């Protein structure tokens, strides 16, 4: 099956008429997967759709579209003067892309902010799996992508040396990470945003990237990881040369590093429709330069929004009056971060819903693959819930007031299921927002109810006297834990290794993006050391209140 995936022709160029004839022939031939692209110019340009048809005469378009394809297929290939048929207009994609632009940028896209976001997915020269962020702003996309990439390494490549990962392997890990984020949208189809190139006099017509034999083998593995084996096999059989030829027809001659204005960029956006994630992985393998070129990060961000669907995104956000990308500073809002991490664009980081002044404000509704902790919680700007603090994998995006970085570990016990003791401690602390390690005696019944413990009034009154014998009006955390969870050990180890990533070169030693490793120690007791001059430790303490960490090589990583 792997041979089918990587067996693609990457040979010489086709003339425009040849490409048109071959694409039309492929559309009429036997194929079961539908792949649609639509030109979604945001103002006055046309939106187009091409469908690789099924073996029956039916297609995803109207019958007129099918007959048009048949006429194109019967036309002589040598008729170079015959113009390529214009596929049908996809008004939905055009409308949604226009509204997504408004949702992200507001009424006007500032040139300087747009330039900060205009970068591709690029790896560090000294840390082959670490993405580089060239300027402030796109960390709202780059940091979550890096987190998912590291999750794949931790879970699927145990024991691998990060410094020995090849470039081809890193590229395929990136594709898997992007597919994971798209899968979180739980959409019936995947709408991938593509930058159509302007015709020119360049000699290279296609953008299909030449890969080494090892790289092609890695591409097959990436396709397998992105979807089930059945999905990958279906994609391999259903879209053989047709996907490649269709991609070449889309990828007109153009300098991929040409600088575009915001209007020019949005006028060239097209969409490709895929039924399964394995086909998306194949597309990215065949068109890796769409990720690596100047607008790769923006294209993927638009793909996530379009795949999720504008109506669902707007329902998650609730308040769409403010753009998701700050018009002055260029950083992404929490809704954008949450969409990349969880597939839902909710604006808050607490668990489930909270009633604030009669308004139901939505937070994170389930345990996420990737966690999130932030310095802003220590500053009392927000409360991060258990779903984000205790993700499925030991990877957390870390937020400062201006930037996002990534914390990760190979220690899987950091995300093992909570013991009853840890649940009790967490619930108790949720009633102690100031971090004083005590609660009001009157809150004891609420805590017991939250823990599903006995909460009869007579029993609560008895426990209040026992836990507050001097009638001070407070119950200490230690007294509560000793009474209800005596001698229970915690699941988190006392010492473990942590690693940190910051994608901005200027925030790294010698301006080279790399991972920094440290040894963490969880101290006895519940009193945390206060170190206001160390934002890294302060942020870590929102997850592990009694943590201390010694960074190797004496270098303290930066959150900014």
UniProtKB/Swiss-Prot annotation:
It comes from the Eukaryota. SMART domains: DUF4205. The modification Phosphoserine is found at residues 212, 219. It is an enzyme of class 3 (hydrolase). Residues 15-30, 52-81 have a biased composition (Low complexity). GO terms for biological process: protein K48-linked deubiquitination; proteolysis. This is Ubiquitin carboxyl-terminal hydrolase MINDY-3 homolog. It comes from Drosophila melanogaster (Fruit fly). The lineage of its organism: Eukaryota, Metazoa, Ecdysozoa, Arthropoda, Hexapoda.
